[in-house]
């Protein structure tokens, strides 16, 4: 059976989809079979028809295997989008699909919507949070963060919330990194030191993203030894 990793972030619009694509392409280059699951998707892509993340995975990253489950047009928190569209989000169905994928792939990357403290739905008089799903099904997570101003607070508070919810963080991945900016350099070092987590990737700020650019970054990630480091943490051999 394969391993599942939940790709979460310190917020929305920080590039989880880009980072997830790089990880998927790198692991495939190492001979692993990889699937990406985006269980809850809200908001449309630039074409005004497709759903944003699925559009990205299929048409930009061109991953061999990616899928979603709940698609909702309003670009808002899943619980509100579900209420407005009459959608019933069932975490048990997501878990069943995830188990099905784990039977068929070495690694399944599950991309969340926003961060850990995002409600999927309301049930039994309470909100069912993203963190509830990770805890209920014992999913380890990678924390994707920006490296710009404000990143320290966002990363530290997210990690504290994860710890309080009993969620295991495997490591950190930084996105939109600007090497010439001292604040970016120091934020990466400071966050890693404060959280005592390994830095598994530092993705530069990209003016434009294409499949070729993603492949280049994936190869660089492999050459740095970070892909194998992640697999070692998971106990997956290559």
Swiss-Prot record:
List the molecular function annotations (GO) for this entry: ATP binding; dethiobiotin synthase activity; magnesium ion binding
Gene (UniProt): bioD
User: What InterPro entries does this protein map onto?
Assistant: DTB_synth_BioD, P-loop_NTPase
Compartments, record wording: Cytoplasm
| Subunit annotation | Homodimer.
Protein's UniProt name: ATP-dependent dethiobiotin synthetase BioD
Q: What is its main location?
A: cytoplasm
Q: In which family does this protein belong, per the annotation?
A: Belongs to the dethiobiotin synthetase family.
Question: Any idea which positions bind ATP?
Answer: 13-18, 111-114, 175-176, 204-206
Superkingdom is Bacteria
Q: What is its EC number?
A: 6.3.3.3
Pathway(s) where this gene product acts:
Cofactor biosynthesis; biotin biosynthesis; biotin from 7,8-diaminononanoate: step 1/2
What GO CC annotations are associated with the protein? Answer: cytosol
Pfam families according to UniProt? AAA_26
Query: Which transformation does this protein catalyse, written as a reaction?
Result: (7R,8S)-7,8-diammoniononanoate + CO2 + ATP = (4R,5S)-dethiobiotin + ADP + phosphate + 3 H(+)
- Cofactor field: Mg(2+)
Binding-site list for substrate = 42
UniProt keyword list? ATP-binding, Biotin biosynthesis, Cytoplasm, Ligase, Magnesium, Metal-binding, Nucleotide-binding
Q: Which residues bind Mg(2+)?
A: 17, 59, 111
Would I find Ligase among this entry's keywords?
yes
């Amino acid at each position: 059976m394969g391993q599942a990793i939940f790709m979460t972030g310190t917020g929305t619009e920080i590039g989880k989809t880009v980072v997830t694509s790089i990880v998927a392409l790198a692991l495939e280059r190492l001979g692993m079979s990889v699937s990406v699951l985006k269980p809850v998707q809200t908001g449309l892509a630039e074409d005004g028809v497709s759903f944003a993340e699925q559009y990205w995975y299929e048409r930009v990253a061109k991953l061999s295997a990616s899928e979603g489950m709940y698609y909702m047009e309003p670009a808002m928190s899943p619980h509100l989008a579900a209420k407005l569209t009459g959608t019933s989000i069932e975490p048990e169905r997501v878990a069943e699909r995830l188990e099905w994928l784990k039977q068929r792939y070495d690694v399944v990357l599950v991309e969340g919507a926003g961060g850990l403290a995002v409600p999927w739905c309301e049930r039994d008089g309470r909100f069912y949070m993203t963190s509830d799903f990770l805890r209920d099904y014992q999913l380890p997570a990678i924390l994707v963060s920006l490296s710009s101003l404000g990143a320290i607070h966002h990363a530290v508070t997210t990690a504290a919330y994860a710890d309080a919810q009993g969620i295991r963080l495997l490591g950190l991945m930084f996105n939109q990194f600007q090497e010439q900016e001292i604040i970016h350099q120091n934020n990466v070092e400071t966050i890693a030191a404060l959280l005592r987590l390994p830095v598994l990737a530092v993705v530069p700020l990209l003016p434009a993203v294409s499949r070729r650019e993603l492949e280049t970054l994936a190869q660089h990630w492999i050459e740095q030894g970070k892909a194998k480091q992640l697999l070692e943490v998971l106990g997956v051999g290559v």
